[in-house]
Amino acid sequence: QLAAHQNLNFSIPTGNFGNVFACYSAFKMGLPINIISVAVNDNDILHRFFGSNDYSKKQVHETISPSMDISVASNFERLVYDFFLDRNASQCAELFNNFPSQGIELDETTWSKKNKLFNSSSVNDAATQEIIQSIFQHHHYLLDPHTAVAMQEAMVSASDKNHFVVLATAHPAKFPDVYKKLDIDLTETPTALTGLFKKTEQLHHFDSNYDQITSFISSHN
């Protein structure tokens, strides 16, 4: 329905850039997209890149949107290769061979390509909680913390002539402590998540050995 009137805007919460690159791939295949908004939490390497051409590794900060708590976006190299460098493999390899010990800064002309398709935002925990509470109070819809990060950009930029699609990425029931703090009751928990937080966590250490790792996976599958 939206596409019948104009190109789409997408706001996507991200850590490792997989969902953003999927959206970009859809654009390459013909989906009518105006802007892809890259939404991150306090771990802002992607926001720093799109905002100021600074792709440098920094310490990870723990947030209430843990899947986005990263220092390096593992899928970002794909966009640099395909979109920014026009599939120049040697140039891309040169940039990332020195990363993360050395940050990445593109030349101004190359970096400015992002203005054609991308923008970004960074949202801290306090703002994330405010968004969750606001949407719940006014629309009776419960956002998970990751989706709430993306909702911020949509709330700021959307208008009657500028519609946004916000990508939802997780079920709220995975984050009970967040809603307890906001005094919001989780009325429904999917069967698959029932008892999840009571299960024993297990940690196994392995050497960098293919046979050892695959043998363990096979025996526990």
Where are these regions (language model features)?
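PLP-dependent amino-acid enzyme catalytic core
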Residues: Q1-N221
